[in-house]
Design a protein with these regions (language model features):
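Glycine-rich catalytic cores of cysteine/serine-nucleophile enzymes that process amide/ester linkages
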Residues: 53-143
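Non-cytosolic head/periplasmic domains of membrane-anchored proteins
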Residues: 111-181
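Short, surface-exposed linear patches
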Residues: 73-76, 83-87, 115-118, 148-151, ...
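Activation targets extended, charge/polar-rich intrinsically disordered C-terminal tails
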Residues: 2-31, 160-243
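Core subunits and conserved enzymes of cellular information-processing
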Residues: 26-52, 58
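N-terminal short leaders/motifs
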Residues: 1-16, 38-47, 68-85
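Short amphipathic alpha-helical surface micro-motifs
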Residues: 33-35, 42-46, 73-78, 107-111, ...
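Extracytoplasmic/periplasmic, Sec-exported soluble proteins
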Residues: 54, 119, 142-146, 150, ...
Length: 243
C-alpha cells in the first residue's frame, strides 16, 4: 500500500469515528446534562394553577389555561389568528422552534437538507401556538400544579419571547387550531425547542434539567411528580397538530 493510500484510509477511518462518535457524545451529554437539576428543592403545590407539559416525541410544549386572574392569553395571541376560532377552547399550548424548519416542514417528507442544516447551525425562532379543548392527561401530556406567583413568572417569560410588534408577524399553522408568531432567540444544538421549554420552567422556579436538548430530558422531571407518574397513556392525543 502506498503512503498516499495509507493516509486516505486513515482519513476515512477518522471520518467514520467522527460520524459514529459525534452522535454518541451528543446523546451522552444530553443524558448527563438533563439529569442535573435546576431548582432542586422545588415541590409541586397542592393548589395554584394547573398547567401541562406535553410532547409528541420530538417537541415539547407548555399548555396553560386560556384565562386566569394572572393572564388572559387571548390578549397576547388573538384567537382570530386561527381558522377555527369559534370552538370552545380551554387551553393554549406554547412551544418554540427554528423558523424555517417549522414553517417549511409541515410533515417530515417536506424536510430538505438545507432547512435541516440551517436549523442545526442556527436560525431565527418562532412561537407555535395551538388551542385545545379540555385536554386529557396522559403519559405524553402531564399535569403540573404550580403556585400563582410561579405561573405569573412563567407567563412573563413566555410573553417576553414574542418579537417586537413592529417587526414580528404571524404565519398560518398546520391545522385549523394553530398559528406561528415571530419570536426572539436563535435555534442551534445548544438551544433547541426542548431546551426552550425547560428554560421557561426553570426561570419560573420549577424543577427541571440543566441541558435538555431532547424531549425525554424535559419530560422525566414532570414524570417524577407523584400525581403525574401514575397516569396512563391516553388513547389519543389532544386536539392539536401532529407536530
Amino acid at each position: 500500500m502506498s503512503v498516499k493510500a495509507g493516509r486516505t484510509k486513515r482519513a476515512a477511518q477518522i471520518a467514520g469515528l467522527i460520524l459514529i462518535g459525534g452522535p454518541l457524545v451528543f446523546l451522552l451529554s444530553a443524558w448527563i446534562g438533563s439529569s442535573i437539576p435546576r431548582n432542586s428543592d422545588w415541590q409541586e403545590t397542592a393548589d395554584g394553577v394547573e398547567i401541562f407539559v406535553g410532547t409528541n416525541g420530538i417537541h415539547t410544549e407548555i399548555v396553560m389555561p386560556i384565562a386566569t386572574d394572572v393572564i388572559d392569553w387571548r390578549g397576547r395571541f388573538p384567537i382570530g389568528d386561527i381558522t377555527a376560532a369559534q370552538r370552545p377552547y380551554t387551553h393554549v399550548a406554547v412551544s418554540w422552534g427554528e423558523k424555517e424548519f417549522f414553517l417549511q416542514t409541515p410533515t417530515w417528507g417536506d424536510l430538505s437538507p438545507g432547512v435541516a442544516l440551517n436549523a442545526v447551525t442556527g436560525g431565527s425562532g418562532v412561537l407555535h401556538i395551538a388551542w385545545y379543548v379540555r385536554p386529557a392527561p396522559s403519559d405524553d401530556f402531564r399535569p403540573l400544579r404550580i403556585t400563582r406567583d410561579q405561573y405569573a413568572s412563567l407567563a412573563a417569560q413566555i410573553t417576553a419571547q414574542l418579537a417586537p410588534e413592529d417587526t414580528g408577524q404571524s404565519y398560518p399553522g398546520y391545522s385549523r387550531n394553530d398559528v406561528f408568531y415571530d419570536a426572539v432567540g436563535t435555534y442551534h444544538l445548544g438551544n433547541t425547542c426542548n431546551q426552550w421549554t425547560s428554560d421557561r420552567l426553570a426561570a419560573a422556579g420549577i424543577k427541571t434539567g440543566l441541558w435538555t436538548p431532547l424531549p425525554g430530558g424535559v419530560m422525566k422531571w414532570v414524570n417524577a411528580l407523584p400525581h403525574a407518574a401514575a397516569l396512563p397513556r391516553a388513547p389519543h392525543a389532544p386536539d392539536a397538530p401532529d407536530r
